[in-house]
Amino acid sequence: MESLSQLVKSTLPNYLSNLPIPDSVGGWFKLSFKDWLALIPPTVVVAGIGYTGYLAFCPAAQARCSATKSGRCNNQIRKHEPKVVDTIDVEDIADKAAFCRCWKSKNWPYCDGSHGEHNKLTGDNVGPVVVKKQ
């Protein structure tokens, strides 16, 4: 407890009072490289506290964080379908090809069915893009 008291009562105030904070706007332009380096640690601490507060209290940040933790690839496209499959007719394809949209295929860009296991684990409905010759 004594070390914490020493930190709060003596060390931290001395550190903050010795920071090269200029008195005017023009003073910021006169700071040396060493002075700018001395200002980096407190700036990082303030930015970290601000970012933590943003994540804790901003509803948009909370929604974005919870959406990425779901493990889903597809969070909004045709969610009412059990599997999203698009067929595109292209004359240059020899017969037909299935292209991966889940980024989990070992044979990417071709689909190897990896989305099936992904869909079971996450409840997602992603499927391949099937391209066939007409």
From Swiss-Prot:
<dbReference type="GO" id="GO:0010506">
    <property type="term" value="P:regulation of autophagy"/>
</dbReference>
<feature type="binding site">
    <location>
        <position position="100"/>
    </location>
    <ligand>
        <name>[2Fe-2S] cluster</name>
    </ligand>
</feature>
<keyword id="KW-0001">2Fe-2S</keyword>
<feature type="topological domain" description="Cytoplasmic">
    <location>
        <begin position="59"/>
        <end position="134"/>
    </location>
</feature>
<feature type="binding site">
    <location>
        <position position="115"/>
    </location>
    <ligand>
        <name>[2Fe-2S] cluster</name>
    </ligand>
</feature>
<dbReference type="GO" id="GO:0005789">
    <property type="term" value="C:endoplasmic reticulum membrane"/>
</dbReference>
<protein>
    <recommendedName>
        <fullName>CDGSH iron-sulfur domain-containing protein 2 homolog</fullName>
    </recommendedName>
</protein>
<dbReference type="GO" id="GO:0046872">
    <property type="term" value="F:metal ion binding"/>
</dbReference>
<dbReference type="InterPro" id="IPR019610">
    <property type="entry name" value="FeS-contain_mitoNEET_N"/>
</dbReference>
<dbReference type="InterPro" id="IPR045131">
    <property type="entry name" value="CISD1/2"/>
</dbReference>
<keyword id="KW-0408">Iron</keyword>
<dbReference type="InterPro" id="IPR018967">
    <property type="entry name" value="FeS-contain_CDGSH-typ"/>
</dbReference>
<keyword id="KW-0472">Membrane</keyword>
<comment type="similarity">
    <text>Belongs to the CISD protein family. CISD2 subfamily.</text>
</comment>
<keyword id="KW-0812">Transmembrane</keyword>
<dbReference type="GO" id="GO:0006839">
    <property type="term" value="P:mitochondrial transport"/>
</dbReference>
<keyword id="KW-0256">Endoplasmic reticulum</keyword>
<dbReference type="InterPro" id="IPR042216">
    <property type="entry name" value="MitoNEET_CISD"/>
</dbReference>
<keyword id="KW-1133">Transmembrane helix</keyword>
<feature type="topological domain" description="Lumenal">
    <location>
        <begin position="1"/>
        <end position="35"/>
    </location>
</feature>
<feature type="binding site">
    <location>
        <position position="102"/>
    </location>
    <ligand>
        <name>[2Fe-2S] cluster</name>
    </ligand>
</feature>
<keyword id="KW-0479">Metal-binding</keyword>
<feature type="transmembrane region" description="Helical">
    <location>
        <begin position="36"/>
        <end position="58"/>
    </location>
</feature>
<dbReference type="GO" id="GO:0051537">
    <property type="term" value="F:2 iron, 2 sulfur cluster binding"/>
</dbReference>
<dbReference type="Pfam" id="PF09360">
    <property type="entry name" value="zf-CDGSH"/>
</dbReference>
<dbReference type="GO" id="GO:0006879">
    <property type="term" value="P:intracellular iron ion homeostasis"/>
</dbReference>
<feature type="binding site">
    <location>
        <position position="111"/>
    </location>
    <ligand>
        <name>[2Fe-2S] cluster</name>
    </ligand>
</feature>
<dbReference type="Pfam" id="PF10660">
    <property type="entry name" value="MitoNEET_N"/>
</dbReference>
<keyword id="KW-0411">Iron-sulfur</keyword>
<dbReference type="GO" id="GO:0005741">
    <property type="term" value="C:mitochondrial outer membrane"/>
</dbReference>
